[in-house]
């Protein structure tokens, strides 16, 4: 069986038009989703094969306000998401339930985009929306950041993305650093999903295939997208290839027993 899913990551900044209308301007509107507007989003499409849980990157699409209006950006995201009515589909985010999906829903409401049926469907779907912040921080008082999780798995996403100030870059309409940050985040979330699935299944193949697939996909982009190309020669890739080969060759026990997860 082949399950199709996507990883979604959204960058948002303060919307001055909304902020001007509120009386409580504490902290300049920081960390208040209703005052934010979406400025960039990346969707990483992937497949997940059963019975072993092998993951494969199918592609990354990125949309931003340098090329699209916000109405067009939201419509493009809606088109790229898998159909929530498909019981085999899956949406993966990092803090998506509290931020990404909330911002997208609220902006769609503000812009009268009530017909975005995939966004609406995933907004209410809980079982197949995998928000990894709960996997990596469910027992701690403070949720782990995506940068912390990436460091746990062996990579510095802020180094890869050159740690831009998203709000300042968006105001200056300097979209390259925003896109770079967004794409690195969505790739890191995909790797985190691979490790989470490997733990859930008791088998290294989801993690190993996530690393190798992302590396192979990014290798072709290295000349024009070095921030993603860096994933192709990461020190963990050789280890992932060896673990994947051992599992496929029957040299490494698989705790999932070939059962779907």
For each predicted feature, which ranges?
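DEDD superfamily 3′-5′ metal-dependent exonuclease/proofreading module
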Residues: 1-261
């Amino acid at each position: 069986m082949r399950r199709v899913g996507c990883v979604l990551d959204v960058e948002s900044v303060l919307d001055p038009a909304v902020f001007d209308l509120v009386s409580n301007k504490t902290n300049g509107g920081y960390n208040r989703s209703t005052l934010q507007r979406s400025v960039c989003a990346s969707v990483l499409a992937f497949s997940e094969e059963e019975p072993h849980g092998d993951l494969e990157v199918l592609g990354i699409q990125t949309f931003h306000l340098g090329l699209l209006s916000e109405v067009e950006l939201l419509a493009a995201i809606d088109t790229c998401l898998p159909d929530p009515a498909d019981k085999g589909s899956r949406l993966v985010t990092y803090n998506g339930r509290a931020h990404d999906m909330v911002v997208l829903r609220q902006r769609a409401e503000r812009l009268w985009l009530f017909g975005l049926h995939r966004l609406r469907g995933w907004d209410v779907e809980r079982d197949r929306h995998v928000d990894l912040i709960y996997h990596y921080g469910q027992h701690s008082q403070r949720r782990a950041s995506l940068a912390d999780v990436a460091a746990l798995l062996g990579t510095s996403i802020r180094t890869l993305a050159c740690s831009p100030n998203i709000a300042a870059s968006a105001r200056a309409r300097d979209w390259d650093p925003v896109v770079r940050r967004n794409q690195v985040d969505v790739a890191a979330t995909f790797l985190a999903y691979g490790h989470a699935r490997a733990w859930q299944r008791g088998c290294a193949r989801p993690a190993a295939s996530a690393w190798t697939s992302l590396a192979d996909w990014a290798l072709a982009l290295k000349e024009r997208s070095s921030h993603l190309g860096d994933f192709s020669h990461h020190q963990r890739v050789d280890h992932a290839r060896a673990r994947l080969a051992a599992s496929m060759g029957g040299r490494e026990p698989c705790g999932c027993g070939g059962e779907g997860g």
